[in-house]
């Protein structure tokens, strides 16, 4: 019994000992211990003569770029004391002095590739650089900061290569051994071979059964099958290139290809030549080849008697021994369907590589498509211009997709077309403005886009041309049936139907202007004197001058709208009595300034608010005749209406005296028939013209007629206070501030302010003159062309732009001015 107890105790002690040993063994890091021992030994060697060994010693244990770790350990047992992390751009560790000191200079990189040796790399220390080498068949990869195996196909063209000892170790056994492979360099694997692909990648492949790889021809060759077989022995061997009437037999211990007699085929089941159709014994789906077809064709049986010819990109034979098509059509233009095909993009302006297709034996093994989306596609300059060219985001360069620059993109043309966004005037400016290709890199640099655009264009007006060819930038006279330049609207060409010749050149002088919607392109306005002409010579300022206004102070002419309106109002509001009995209007009371500024005054009449009384007599009045003696009465008779005054006592005091008027009585109510004072004459003097311009195209004309008569001023006030409005035009009632103003309010309702016999009215047009998609801008393209029509909260107002109060939605129109609006283009 005691022996059993002792045995059990012994086993227990052994188990405990094993556990303790394993714990110590597995926890103990022999490599780390050896490193610390080496550090301690090195320190002792270099400093023991000067310093005693410290209790704690530090050393740099790990480095990652500019960050390093200092590990401190006890020198008596080499156990870790503590670890600290540091940045070598701030401080460096002096191993011998065992202290830190400030970094004297910043080290750009601790690890760098060697410029002359891909197998080497450079380590930068605090005081010097050390060149290190990777193992053989390795190169240093700076991106990974490590040594990586060399690609076996780096220096080999696409094709098949024998598998030597090094390739076998590295690619098959995944072993990178540091040994001398030159001893067995002549040896190769019999069936395995290396296949280098066109994209630089590789695969390890093996020859079929009964085949051996021939390094001399770089192909798999069939092993001899006729060893020990008699002549005439037919082999059950059918190579891919064997025709339907051919078979393989032995002759002198070698296999040779034989043919069946004419009109015979070789039956591979009967293993003999038969006189029959190739499909007779095999049926539908069987495939075969003949001598009269191409290398990429084969016949496929439809039934026992018919077959069809199949043409492929590449003909192969599958595992069932039947022919089939393989390959990608994109590889068809490559020799043997193997190689690299770089995709090139070419347009009128640029040429660049957009990607790469890599094929091997007519199969696509890799394809790279770079992101060639247009970096300019969403750019709109000056809110209306876009570039009719594309610059890619990426291009294919040196085997990868990289950002596109003018260094890897070829420029084919120094200019490119520019297109403007659609506008309400249907104006196409592609012949007026051409872009310079030098603009593109400046735009990509992020400069002010609008300024960069405007400074890098060519204008037709700058070269004295009506238009420019959008592609070649050459001057042209026609593009279609008419050609004009809205940036220089002084002329236009009427062309033939085919657009190959000029029928007539129009020149717009004073009184005429370019009207784009008229067939003859000519509009007339007696006041217009090319006020919309742009005088800038700087292209940036010209292209920015899309909307501006010209104000002109001039005289009212006898035939213009001011004369017509005020003449009509004067006739209507001039009266002889309080009952507004109108007098026949006479032009002798109307004074219109002709082109020379001549002021014409009326005859001597009493004006309203005059302070000079009437004369006692009129020396030019008709003389009266005395009926008694037929003599003319004197112009002035001092005794007329006189009485003889006699004193009561007589004497010299008697005399003639004037007849005294009756006593002054209170004023009585004037008789309704009492004539009104004569009214002031109609004076037509000044007017303001406001021309709205779309570049050099006059779009709207606002006329401000000055009123210089009290009658007209009162009439204007009366008209504005008594405006009539059609029910459907109630939202547009404020159009009355400007006559002939128009607003489209939606739902087929177009309203216009008019002056008629009844006064000023805002009426609904039977058919709207214009229908706008954008009610707020009163346009179709979202541009506010008419600056004198304003929209707010569903209400419409016509008001000169300089008098409009947007906050209060109010028109601060003057009492002595009447406004009239003309649309000069429609």
Curated annotation (Swiss-Prot):
GO MF annotations in UniProt: chitin binding; zinc ion binding
Record keywords: Chitin-binding, Disulfide bond, Glycoprotein, Metal-binding, Repeat, Signal, Virion, Zinc, Zinc-finger
Listed Acidic residues bias regions: 668-677
Localization annotation: Virion
Residues in C2HC BV-type zinc fingers: 147-196
Disordered: annotated span: 651-679
Record-linked Pfam families: Baculo_VP91_N
Domain Chitin-binding type-2 residue range list: 223-281
GO cellular component: extracellular region; virion component
Keyword check for Signal: yes
Annotated disulfide bonds: 207-220, 260-273
Glycan-carrying positions: 210, 333, 371, 413, 510, 520, 609, 722
Signal peptide (from-to): 1-18
InterPro entries assigned to the protein according to its UniProt record, in alphabetical order: BaculoV_Vp91_N, Chitin-bd_dom, Chitin-bd_dom_sf
Function: Probable capsid-associated protein.
Name this polypeptide is given: Capsid-associated protein Vp91
Organism: Epiphyas postvittana nucleopolyhedrovirus
């Amino acid at each position: 019994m005691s022996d059993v107890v002792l045995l059990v105790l012994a086993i227990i002690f052994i188990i405990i000992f094993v556990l303790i040993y394993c714990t110590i063994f597995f926890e103990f890091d022999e490599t780390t211990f050896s490193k610390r021992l080496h550090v301690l030994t090195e320190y002792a060697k270099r400093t023991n003569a000067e310093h005693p060994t410290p209790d704690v010693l530090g050393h740099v244990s790990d480095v990652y770029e500019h960050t390093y770790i200092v590990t401190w350990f006890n020198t008596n047992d080499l156990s870790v004391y503590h670890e600290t992390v540091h940045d070598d751009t701030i401080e460096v560790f002096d191993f011998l002095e065992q202290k830190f000191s400030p970094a004297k200079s910043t080290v750009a990189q601790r690890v760098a590739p060697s410029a002359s040796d891909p197998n080497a790399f450079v380590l930068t220390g605090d005081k010097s650089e050390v060149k290190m080498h990777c193992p053989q068949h390795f190169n240093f990869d700076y991106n990974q900061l490590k040594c990586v195996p060399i690609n076996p196909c780096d220096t080999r063209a696409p094709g098949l290569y024998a598998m030597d000892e090094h390739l076998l170790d590295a690619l098959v056994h995944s072993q990178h051994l540091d040994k001398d492979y030159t001893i067995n360099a002549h040896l190769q694997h019999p069936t395995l071979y290396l296949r280098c692909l066109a994209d630089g990648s590789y695969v390890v492949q093996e020859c079929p059964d009964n085949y051996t790889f021939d390094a001399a021809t770089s192909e798999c060759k069939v092993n001899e099958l006729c060893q020990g077989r008699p002549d005439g022995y037919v082999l059950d061997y059918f190579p891919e290139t064997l025709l339907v009437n051919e078979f393989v037999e032995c002759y002198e211990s070698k296999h040779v290809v034989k043919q069946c007699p004419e009109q015979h085929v070789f039956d591979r089941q009967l293993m003999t030549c038969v006189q029959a159709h190739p499909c007779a014994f095999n049926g539908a789906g069987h495939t075969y080849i003949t001598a009269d077809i191409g290398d990429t064709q084969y016949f496929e049986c439809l039934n026992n008697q018919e077959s069809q010819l199949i043409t492929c990109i590449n003909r192969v034979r599958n595992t069932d021994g039947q022919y089939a098509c393989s390959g990608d059509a994109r590889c068809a233009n490559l020799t043997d369907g193997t190689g690299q095909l770089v995709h090139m993009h070419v347009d009128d302006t640029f040429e660049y590589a957009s990607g790469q297709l890599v094929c091997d034996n007519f199969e696509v093994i890799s394809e790279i498509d770079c992101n060639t989306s247009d970096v300019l596609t969403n750019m709109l300059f000056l809110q209306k211009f876009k570039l009719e060219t594309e610059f890619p985001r990426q291009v294919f360069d040196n085997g990868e997709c990289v950002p596109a620059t003018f260094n890897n993109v070829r420029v084919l043309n120094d200019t490119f077309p520019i297109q403007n966004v659609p506008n309400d005037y249907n104006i196409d400016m592609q012949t007026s403005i051409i872009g310079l290709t030098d603009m593109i890199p400046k735009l990509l640099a992020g400069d002010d886009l609008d300024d960069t655009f405007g400074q890098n264009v060519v204008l037709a007006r700058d070269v004295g041309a009506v238009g420019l060819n959008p592609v070649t930038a050459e001057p042209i006279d026609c593009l279609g049936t008419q050609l004009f330049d809205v940036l220089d609207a002084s002329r236009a060409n009427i062309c033939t139907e085919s657009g190959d010749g000029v029928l007539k050149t129009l020149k717009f002088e004073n009184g005429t202007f370019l009207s784009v919607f008229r067939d003859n392109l000519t509009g007339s306005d007696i006041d217009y004197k090319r006020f919309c002409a742009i005088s800038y010579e700087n292209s940036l300022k010209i292209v920015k001058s899309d909307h501006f206004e010209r104000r002109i102070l001039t005289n009212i002419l006898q035939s213009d709208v001011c004369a017509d309106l005020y003449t009509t109002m004067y006739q209507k509001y001039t009266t002889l009595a309080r009952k507004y009995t109108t007098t026949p209007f006479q032009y002798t009371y109307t004074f219109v300034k002709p082109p020379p500024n001549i002021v014409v005054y009326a005859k001597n009449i009493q004006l309203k608010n005059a302070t000079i009384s009437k004369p006692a007599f009129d020396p030019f009045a008709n003389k009266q005749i005395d009926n008694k003696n037929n003599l003319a009465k004197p112009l002035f008779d001092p005794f007329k209406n006189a009485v003889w005054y006699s004193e009561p006592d007589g004497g010299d005091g008697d005399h003639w005296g004037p007849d005294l008027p009756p006593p002054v009585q209170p004023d009585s109510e004037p008789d309704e028939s009492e004539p009104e004072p004569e009214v002031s004459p109609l004076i037509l003097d000044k007017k303001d013209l406001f021309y709205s311009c779309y570049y050099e195209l006059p779009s709207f004309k606002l006329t401000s007629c000055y009123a210089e008569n009290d009658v007209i001023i009162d009439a204007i006030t009366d008209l504005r206070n008594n405006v009539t409005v059609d029910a459907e035009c109630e939202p547009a009632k404020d159009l009355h501030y400007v006559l002939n103003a128009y607003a489209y309010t939606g739902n087929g309702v177009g309203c216009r302010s008019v002056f008629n016999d009844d006064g000023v009215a805002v009426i609904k047009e039977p058919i709207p003159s214009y229908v706008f998609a954008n009610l707020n801008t009163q346009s179709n393209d979202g541009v506010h062309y008419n600056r004198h029509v304003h929209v707010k909260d569903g209400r419409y107002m016509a008001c000169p732009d300089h008098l409009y109060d947007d906050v209060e939605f109010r028109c601060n129109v003057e009492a002595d001015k009447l406004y009239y609006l003309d649309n000069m283009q429609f």
